[in-house]
Amino acid sequence: DKDAGHETQVCVCHFNSNEMKPEQILLDVHTHTIASGHAFSSLQEMVHAAAEKGLQILGITEHAPGIPGTCSPIYFRNLHVVPRKMYGVELLLGAELNILDYEGHIDLEEFYWKMLDIRIAGIHSLCYQNGTIEQNTSAMLGAIRHPYVQIISHPGDGTADLLFEPIVLAAKETGTLLEINNSSLNPVRHKVKAHDNNLEILRLCKQYEVPVILGSDAHISFSIAQYDHIYPLLQEVDFPDTLILNDKPEQFKRLLKPLPA
């Protein structure tokens, strides 16, 4: 939290398409394997693809039980059997948790949260009853303030209408990272609000100097570290390169919200 020194202070320079190239991307921490039920690559295939793309860190964040067809909780309990470095890539094994209600409660249980290397959370229509913009914002703020939630996935995808300024300010205060999600911006997803929502998030993060994490949300190995739908938005708002963490693995690890004592 702010008092513990987690409020982020970052110097600002501006995004330039010539400064950050795909080969400079060193981490992607929102991906899924076949364990999520509707993805198409194995864990080893995902890590191998990450190594081929030159990544230093890969996060594999399987869907939590609120999503039909995903793995059962025992999957997360057994993550200890997986090496945390493969093909030269550091692995962060975790979950994409589901925001369940207007208070920001998430699924799984604390017993499992503690076993994860990384914890992201988002709103998914399959397990969230859409409310008013105030109710949805309350849900998101509750998740941002949750001590175990480190990253908010696809806040701009339009699944729920949100007030973004309080969300960005809460992220800054708590050290919770906001994701700009490439998959949400893919035209084949037909998420009509995603473009404008993500532009607003980026403008607010620029205004308040809040770092963001780009997420591929890859459900197949070919999509790892694929941010092609995000780059035009970064250029449109002249987003500061120093606030993008995907080419800064050590800074990312420093800024990742620590677990409760």
Which role does the model predict for each range below?
Residues K21-P22, A64, G69-I180, Q235-I244, ...:
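Extended substrate/RNA-proximal surfaces in nucleic-acid metabolism proteins
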Residues V29-L43, N98, H124-T132:
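Active-site mouth loops of central-metabolism enzymes
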Residues H30-I34, H63, H154, H219:
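Histidine-centered divalent metal-coordination motifs
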Residues G37-S41, T70-C71, D161-V168, V188-L202, ...:
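Histidine/acidic-residue-rich catalytic or RNA/ligand-binding cores of hydrolases
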Residues H63, V210-I224:
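Short acidic/histidine-rich active-site segments
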Residues L177-H190:
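His/Asp/Glu-enriched short active-site or ligand-binding loop at hydrolase and phosphoryl-transfer sites
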